[in-house]
């Protein structure tokens, strides 16, 4: 009882003591992005905009997600699951639900509904899973790996039995941090253009977002307003459908395209032979759906 009374007395004294005004509001949640903020402002972003973003309490290093980039990959996604009859039936239902935007995409870009649907199925299970990591944290953490301290934090987070060699890690980190900085700039530009709070956008640990899983530079280059509401929202199915079709058209999709050329076009979406062959197989099985 004596100890309890003493603790209460000390707590009252602490509460009565003066504290710096605004200390809680201005304290940075994470100091690892200071040099990154300087770079962004130097590259043309408004200082107030950048400071406001990075002082948000939800902004922090995405250590767990980014470490996945640097682990030995012992398994790959089971793409065969997407050709199961129950999954294909969901894809057929999706094609009926979004018949109009799919038809509009085919009219405007020449890409058949079954091809767009196949990509959406493999990417996000038709929008059911678009990722749960803050895109800002993922891209900022990768971009901040230009700083040796951040890079060491990522290295130490990787289990020893899953690590690349340190030389391989450094080489990959150099490539990834340059890529991520470009993606971060594109992401912030997109969020400003569409008046979206960048701290609220979730996606994959690689920084891809929306139903179509576009990376930010692809959003700026290829994303389209599919529902004619004056905005580009990759979490909206009509926008995602139009954006995928526009992307494929840009890389050479055309009417009556052969399988070999179709393979080359889709390979630009995801540089995996397994992925491309699965998309083409799904599209073939969906032919005739209306």
Stretch-by-stretch model annotation:
Residues 1-207, 211-213, 217-290:
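Cell-wall glycan-active module
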């Amino acid at each position: 009882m004596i100890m309890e009374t003493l603790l209460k007395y000390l707590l009252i004294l602490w509460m009565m003591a003066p504290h710096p005004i605004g200390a809680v509001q201005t304290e940075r949640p994470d100091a690892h992005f200071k040099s990154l903020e300087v770079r962004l402002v130097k590259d043309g972003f408004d200082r107030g905009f950048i400071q406001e973003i990075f002082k948000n309490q939800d902004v922090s290093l995405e250590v767990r997600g980014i470490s996945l980039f640097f682990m030995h990959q012992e398994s790959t996604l089971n793409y065969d699951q997407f050709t199961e009859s129950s999954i294909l039936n969901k894809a057929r239902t999706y094609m009926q639900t979004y018949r109009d935007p799919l038809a509009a995409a085919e009219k405007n870009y020449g890409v058949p509904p079954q091809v767009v649907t196949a990509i959406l199925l493999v990417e996000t299970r038709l929008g059911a899973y678009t990722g749960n990591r803050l895109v800002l944290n993922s891209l900022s953490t990768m971009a901040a790996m230009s700083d040796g301290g951040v890079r060491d934090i990522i290295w130490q987070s990787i289990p020893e039995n899953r690590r690349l060699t340190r030389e391989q890690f450094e080489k990959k980190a150099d490539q990834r941090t340059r890529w991520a900085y470009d993606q971060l700039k594109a992401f912030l530009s997109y969020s400003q253009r569409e008046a979206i709070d960048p701290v609220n956008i979730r996606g994959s640990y690689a920084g891809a977002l929306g139903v179509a899983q576009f990376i930010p530079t692809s959003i700026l280059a290829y994303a389209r307003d599919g529902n004619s509401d004056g905005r580009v929202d990759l979490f909206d199915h009509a926008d995602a459908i139009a954006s995928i079709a526009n992307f494929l058209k840009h890389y050479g999709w055309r009417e009556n395209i052969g399988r070999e050329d179709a393979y080359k076009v889709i390979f630009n979406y995801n540089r995996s032979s397994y992925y491309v062959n699965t998309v083409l197989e799904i599209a073939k099985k969906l032919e005739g759906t209306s």
